């Protein structure tokens, strides 16, 4: 009877007295947001773990996963799932729209549940800082879903730079071929009927309530500021993590952004961001001077480095690019840090100091999180993108969004990272943003008719972007001291 109980009882019951779940036991995992990347994450763990609960605000979009896992209990509202099944859940996978990542993740962590949250980790700087501190205070195992951080390409980039192979790095340029969804759009003028299979109130969550339009969901929410973070949120966690880790970055001190037409509700079609990071503590074989990190998307690209092979495409594997400009050489890699190479043609033989994760891009990233969940806290090896690193790295992404949305101030913004505030936005400065682009051609003649917001206090506007004011009924846990 005891053996039968051990096979059937929740692993949270079996492991808590020992502080861990034995590797032979299966985690009881709940998933929130299962129709897109959540489905992929579930597929990578379901063979070895128990998927006990599934939650989604759109049951038509989620139907395929519901059908694949008929024994899992189904929910619309993650809060009800946590209330009813909290004692039976060990860990949660979260793959909802960006604007709900933080609250769903934070609530799970405060319940003592391990969490795997898709990228971008959060929608704002404050939310990232909160999850970083909650990870430290709760001790749960955390992982952001940027699988390239576990891939060997990222390991090689770090090892080459730390071994001094390219010298000191003072400039990094990163680019993506995204967005591949609509951006630069006016707010829809018509309201569509909400499908019976979609709970629009729950999708909206802590954001302001907008009239439903089919342009927002599914997937295209990425381009709308209330729900997504544009191409930065979609791809920067894959492409900026290599410079963040390899160069030991933390908070930038200066940010600036520019873009195609900036609208108040929708991300621009293309953008450029520059973040300046102060000098860090030198490593044994390489210095860590002040460094500029540049981001390009929407077709914008950095210049081809001097000596780059003619006829060779600058952006390579995965639709992403990173160029590390060193004093001795130039290191170039694709999306996720894959296929790194040196412009000189040398092939470094640097010591392999980074832990390798097998099959990182094909489930290894998720299973490395599962491994850590089952280990004893006293000897646990955290996964490669746990929130102690993913949280500050995601702040870098959120800072890029801030730089774009505040570009109308027409200056380099100075950032106090420790206190999460800009130091050079005056109390009386104002900002206007375009609401609607009314460009038309009539009888062969163009007409330009932009509708602008009224001037708003720039400091208050920035503060709301840094720390969102949640809709009534939605509240984050308090920031741990």
Model-derived features: where do they sit?
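Short, small-residue-biased leader/transition segments that mark boundaries at the very start
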Residues: 1-5
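Hydrophobic residues in well-ordered beta-strands that form the structural core
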Residues: 31, 94, 117, 142-144, ...
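Core domains of carbohydrate- and sulfate-ester-processing enzymes
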Residues: 173-214, 426, 430-466
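A contiguous active-site-proximal alpha/beta segment in oxidoreductase catalytic domains
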Residues: 114-116, 122-198
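Oxidoreductase and adenylate-handling cofactor-binding alpha/beta cores
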Residues: 151-174, 186-189, 204, 233-260, ...
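Glycine-enriched catalytic-core subsegment of oxygenase/oxidase enzymes
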Residues: 47-48, 55, 59-62, 235, ...
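N-terminal Rossmann-like dinucleotide-binding module
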Residues: 7-69, 148-151, 243
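Beta-loop-alpha module in the N-terminal Rossmann-like domain of NAD(P)-dependent dehydrogenases
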Residues: 72-130
């Amino acid at each position: 009877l005891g053996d039968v109980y051990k096979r059937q009882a929740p692993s949270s019951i079996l492991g808590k007295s020992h502080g861990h779940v034995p590797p032979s036991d299966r985690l009881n995992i709940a998933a929130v947001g299962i129709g897109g990347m959540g489905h992929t994450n579930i597929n990578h763990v379901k063979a070895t773990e128990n998927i006990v609960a599934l939650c989604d605000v759109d049951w038509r979009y989620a139907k395929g996963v519901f059908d694949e896992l008929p024994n899992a209990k189904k929910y619309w509202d993650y809060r009800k799932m946590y209330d009813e099944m909290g004692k039976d859940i060990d860990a949660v996978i979260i793959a909802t729209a960006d604007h709900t990542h933080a609250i769903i993740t934070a609530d799970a962590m405060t319940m003592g549940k391990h969490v795997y949250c898709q990228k971008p980790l959060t929608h704002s700087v404050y939310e990232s800082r909160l999850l970083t501190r909650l990870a430290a205070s709760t001790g749960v195992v955390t992982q952001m879903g940027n699988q390239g951080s576990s891939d060997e390409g990222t390991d090689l980039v770090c090892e080459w730079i730390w071994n001094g192979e390219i010298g000191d790095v003072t400039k990094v340029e990163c680019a993506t071929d995204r967005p591949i969804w609509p951006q630069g759009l006016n707010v829809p003028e018509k309201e569509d009927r909400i499908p019976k299979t979609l709970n629009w109130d729950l999708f909206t969550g802590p954001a302001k309530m907008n009239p439903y339009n089919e342009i927002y969901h599914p997937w295209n929410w990425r381009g709308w500021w209330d729900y997504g973070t544009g191409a930065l949120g979609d791809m920067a966690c894959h492409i900026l993590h290599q410079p963040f880790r390899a160069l030991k970055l933390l908070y930038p001190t200066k940010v600036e952004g520019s873009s195609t037409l900036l609208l108040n509700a929708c991300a621009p079609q293309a953008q450029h961001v520059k973040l300046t990071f102060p000098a860090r503590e030198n490593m044994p074989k390489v210095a860590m001077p002040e460094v500029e990190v540049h981001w390009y998307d929407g077709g914008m690209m950095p210049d081809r480095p001097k000596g780059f092979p003619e006829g060779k495409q600058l952006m390579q594997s995965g639709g992403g690019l990173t160029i590390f400009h060193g004093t001795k050489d130039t290191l170039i890699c694709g999306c996720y840090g894959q296929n790194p190479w040196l412009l000189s043609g040398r092939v470094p033989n640097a010591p392999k100091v980074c832990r390798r994760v097998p099959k990182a891009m094909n489930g290894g990233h998720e299973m490395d999180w599962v491994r850590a969940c089952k280990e004893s806290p006293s000897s646990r090896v955290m996964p490669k993108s746990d929130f102690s690193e993913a949280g500050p790295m995601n702040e870098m992404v959120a800072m890029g969004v801030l730089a774009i949305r505040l570009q109308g101030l027409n200056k380099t913004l100075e950032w106090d990272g420790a206190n999460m505030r800009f130091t050079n936005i005056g109390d009386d400065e104002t900002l206007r943003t375009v609401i609607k682009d009314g460009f038309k051609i009539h009888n062969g003649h163009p007409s330009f008719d932009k509708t602008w917001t009224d001037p708003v206090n720039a400091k208050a506007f920035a503060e709301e972007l840094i720390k969102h004011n949640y809709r009534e009924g939605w509240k984050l846990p308090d920031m741990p001291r």
